[in-house]
């Protein structure tokens, strides 16, 4: 479903994508098809936001995505909430027209659809996390001395 969502985002030109998960361990972010979809999607005026407890698994498991993230840093906002309970952080792919929410990430069970009520409610929850329960994270480059 995540693969199809990113392909749809590219095809339909979604203005914004927001993804949230404790660590994105089981998301297909590093797959060639996903990164190609994101590459096709990324244009001026687009926004991509990520929220996680930790980005360690993203860096370790999704090298193609990490490379894409570095290229498109100017459209990305990455936030982290390291003290959050991993089961408390929503596991979501949100766009202005469609949302996928994993209600049970362990069993990968959830809901998806374009219903306005669901999209608004999920976005409000995500906004709360982004505004008051997280801080900047997952820099596009790591500068060392």
Model-derived segments and their meaning:
Residues 1-18, 22-145:
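PLD/PLD-like phosphodiesterase catalytic module centered on the HKD motif
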């Amino acid at each position: 479903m995540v693969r199809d969502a990113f392909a749809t985002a590219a095809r339909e030109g979604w203005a914004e994508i927001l993804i949230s998960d404790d660590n994105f361990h089981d998301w297909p972010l590093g797959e060639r098809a996903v990164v190609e979809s994101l590459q096709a999607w990324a244009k001026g005026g687009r926004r991509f936001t990520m929220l996680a407890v930790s980005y360690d698994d993203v860096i370790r498991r999704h090298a193609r995505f990490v490379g894409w993230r570095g290229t498109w840093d100017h459209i990305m906002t990455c936030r982290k909430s390291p003290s959050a309970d991993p089961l408390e952080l929503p596991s979501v792919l949100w766009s202005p027209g469609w949302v996928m929410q994993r209600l049970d990430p362990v069993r990968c069970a959830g809901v998806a659809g374009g219903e306005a009520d669901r999209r608004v409610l999920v976005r409000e929850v995500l906004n709360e996390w982004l505004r008051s329960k997280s801080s900047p994270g997952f820099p596009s480059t790591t500068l060392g001395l």
